């Protein structure tokens, strides 16, 4: 039988900080020697690109494509050494492959401001839940995430889905005002954990957070408006990271500003994944190609159930589930605003 505790729906966004930490959690945190992770303020939606900026970027892209096409034409007609074709032809095909990658990149990013962000939702009759799958994360990781999830605005339930079946996690979740759920076996890992929760919870929309991703209070307020379109199944937000000592941020200092080195807030905004989450992902909205990135996403439960739940056949259950949703005619959206921050 699944184990679950605490059936209280979180009605007050400010009540989480009043919950004491359980004694076992305090001991675990002290023994780890690691501080509880801070919760940084979130980012904001980037301003729309100006017409002049778009024109310059598109002009440079077209110039690059034209130059590349002329170069490949010259290579094919005058430069490929057919006397040594076993070297020359594969090399030429690699160059063609690179050019096609540039063309596809330009095509997908030609227009990125295609879906205006809806106004924040201040009240809703929908049933909401935040799901936090966990297996072996320590208290210094779980505590900030659970506390912040309980404090997310709009009435909702917070569920800690513990595949580690740890009594202290149940104690921590209960103390912070969250519900606790475990299962007898860890079949299909995270995907199976989420599918098990879908059989238990009563929700119209769920926010899925990795155990190390701390949500910001407006996670639901800024994303629920997209679901006014009954075809929308998923809203994905950027993945961002608040610890500055990881490989994600190791190149931040080489990015200079007019004032010199980046300050901490600028370093927080810069990581290895900035190109994808701030440039490439927004361009996918035009083609209904946004996909679930595993965390920081809000999903329509009815859509998940329509495709048989979270895909379990591969370890990339997020993208696989998105493919299933698209196959069934559902739409997906990328909301280009940081609404959760994690540990890299």
Q: Where is each model-derived feature located?
A:
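Long helical/loop segments within the catalytic core of UDP-sugar-dependent glycosyltransferases
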Residues: 108, 181-205, 217-315, 326-327
